[in-house]
């Protein structure tokens, strides 16, 4: 078997990626989230495939087909809630994974980091088009509001929106194409995740100390296969608890009402994992400015490798930067809360302050803190 895994062309790829891969001996539980994201992706593709077998992408039958899945299909309710809550789980793991990358300076592997940002954009696009498919009130109005943002683009905006809609409003054509996008995008994400891994394995993993660990690396199997397996069991336990006991906790009650173009919900808002970006969008009174801020709130991550001023890679021994990092985490939680609140005082001003703080920490305060820490260490 040993000879085969080292000589067979297919087995060799698996061997180099998951068995004999040299891995730092001191990577913590925060490094588990990469493999957990892979698990979430497989889970989403499998549950999605079974849902697609029963779903119909037509405005007249989409809502009732989802109801049919929950009521008449054997274990359909379980598959549907696993898929819906699996998206939330995916984004929890994704945000922790990005947070770990920022904390430990993993963004200095620029190719891996940039592909990761592209993966984040694709995942957000997949989640958005997927949220439209049940054709409930929030699905319809969410699709209308978010796609309408593109009309802020000068000259081509309105044409672009109508092109995406396939008409003059969100209708049958929109739903059909969104279903097609939602089906194909996860496979593109899977292919990109392979490229993400390919570039990661070119450089090797970073570690909590942020220093080279070539002299002490250990094989991935059995150490990290066991660790990842334990992480997967813990994650699935939490996930199934959520699915079986609190299936609607993270959803919107408005989505249990069929889409009605003549009745606008009192508060149109996306799923909870987009609320931070939605709050940034709403905090700018100008439409084009809001759209630019929304895109830049994610795109700003691509600037991190160029804003790294510290002589140390990780934040493990940098108290000033650590304080700023946890302030950023708190700020994102506040933005998420604000995104779900109505547009009225005091939420407007809180959202604006939190948005300014978000960009200030990343673009100004973190680089300055790095320089101050260098001075403190006389570097």
Swiss-Prot record:
Transmembrane segments: 33-53, 77-98, 113-133, 178-198, 226-246, 288-308, 320-340, 347-367
Matching Gene3D superfamilies: Cytochrome Bc1 Complex, Chain C
Record's keyword terms, sorted: Electron transport, Heme, Iron, Membrane, Metal-binding, Mitochondrion, Mitochondrion inner membrane, Respiratory chain, Transmembrane, Transmembrane helix, Transport, Ubiquinone
Cofactor descriptive note: Binds 2 heme b groups non-covalently.
Other information: Heme 1 (or BL or b562) is low-potential and absorbs at about 562 nm, and heme 2 (or BH or b566) is high-potential and absorbs at about 566 nm.
PANTHER family in UniProt: CYTOCHROME B
Name recorded for this polypeptide: Cytochrome b
């Amino acid at each position: 078997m040993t000879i085969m895994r080292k000589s067979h062309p297919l087995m060799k790829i698996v061997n180099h990626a998951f068995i004999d891969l040299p891995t730092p001996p001191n990577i913590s539980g925060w490094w588990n989230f990469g493999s957990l994201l892979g698990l979430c992706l497989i889970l989403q593709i499998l549950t999605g495939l079974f849902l697609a077998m029963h779903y119909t992408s037509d405005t007249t039958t989409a809502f009732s087909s989802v109801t049919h899945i929950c009521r008449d299909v054997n274990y359909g309710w379980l598959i549907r809630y696993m898929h819906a809550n699996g998206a939330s789980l995916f984004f929890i793991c994704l945000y922790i994974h990005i947070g770990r990358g920022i904390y430990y300076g993993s963004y200095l592997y620029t190719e891996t980091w940039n592909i990761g940002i592209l993966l984040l954009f694709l995942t957000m696009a997949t989640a958005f088009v997927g949220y439209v498919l049940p054709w409930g009130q929030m699905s319809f109005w969410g699709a209308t509001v978010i796609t309408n943002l593109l009309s802020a683009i000068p000259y081509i905006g309105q044409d672009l929106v109508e092109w995406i809609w396939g008409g003059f409003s969100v209708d049958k054509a929109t739903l059909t194409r969104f279903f097609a996008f939602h089906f194909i995008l996860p496979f593109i994400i899977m292919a990109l995740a392979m490229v993400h891994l390919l570039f990661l394995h070119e450089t090797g993993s970073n570690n909590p100390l942020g220093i080279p660990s070539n002299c002490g690396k250990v094989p991935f199997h059995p150490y990290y296969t066991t660790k990842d397996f334990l992480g997967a069991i813990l994650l699935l336990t939490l996930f199934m608890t959520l699915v079986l006991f609190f299936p609607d906790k993270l959803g919107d009650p408005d989505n249990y009402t069929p889409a009605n173009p003549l009745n606008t919900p009192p508060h149109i808002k996306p799923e909870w994992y987009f609320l931070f970006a939605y709050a940034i969008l709403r905090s700018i009174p100008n439409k084009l400015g809001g759209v630019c801020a929304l895109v830049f709130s994610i795109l700003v991550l691509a600037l991190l490798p160029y804003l790294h001023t510290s002589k140390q890679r990780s934040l493990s021994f940098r108290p000033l930067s650590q304080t700023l990092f946890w302030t950023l985490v708190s700020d994102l939680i506040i933005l998420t809360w604000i995104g779900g609140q109505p547009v009225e005082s005091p939420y407007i001003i809180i959202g604006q302050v939190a948005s300014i703080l978000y960009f200030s920490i990343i673009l100004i305060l973190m680089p300055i803190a790095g320089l101050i820490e260098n001075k403190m260490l006389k570097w």
